[in-house]
């Protein structure tokens, strides 16, 4: 019984960072806009990630889950290295992190809304 409690506690401790990260709680809650150039993109699971160059800084931008990206109309080809885009969403609450969660991407004047229910 004691080892079962220990395993349950250990599982909860190890899962906490992942649960805290997914969702919006790690952001500062304010609106944030970032315009730059795609250095790399991965629209895979558990959620897509863009690496962008903005004024000589490297930013990590979390986009939606694969189904959400597809529903918004995003494709890998749109996010090829060198593509310029604007991302609207929320940045990390830690200002030392160049990290944000995207709600919308604007590519060639076309808006791709990942979270239409949050608008």
Tell me what each language-model feature is.
Residues 36-38:
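Conserved hydrophobic positions within beta-strands
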